[in-house]
Amino acid sequence: MRITDLLKACSVELNGTPQTKEETIKQMVALMEKGGNVTDVEKYKAGVFAREEEGTTGIGEGIAIPHAKTDAVNAPGLAAMVIPAGVDYDALDGQPVDLVFLIAAPNTEDNVHLEVLSRLSMLLMDESFKQNLLKAKTVEEFLAVVDRAENAKNEAEEEKAVNVPDSGYRVLAVTACPTGIAHTYMAAEGIEKAASCLLYTSDAADEL
């Protein structure tokens, strides 16, 4: 499932001005509602806030990925907001957040939010990807940046599947994160990149 299949133009805001974490989430939920993915806005919003109580989704480096899986959602969806001035989101690194992606997943979809979270986290490992999103002047440009990054990622994965070495070392890495799984996915991506630089083959497993 591609990110661009879930992220509609009406659910993207390039000039967000929330002043607090609470305002940020409320505005993100309103963007999600525009996409028609939510049947009960208040219930979905409560689900997002409940997830935040378990641990912040401000993963650091100016990024937050709040999410909720609930029967208040009728179809998987994404919303995105750029906050030029940044906002205090209680992020893990204590820094302001200027890029937020909100994920909505229905209870009927098995782990769809984890799939989306995984793809987003891995793309956001590339600082140039994030900067291009922040610099986007139009929603269309923002979506085009996401589309190009996904295409490049898919091509790299296909090439990796074809060019599996017949010999050499293989590295198995198991990662875990006590504050949420976004860092687990990002760690797995980082391990694979490091292994590639050393010409090793890596199988990074996520402990969810």
Stretches with model-predicted labels:
Residues D203-L208:
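A short, hydrophobic C-terminal helix/tail in secreted or cell-surface proteins
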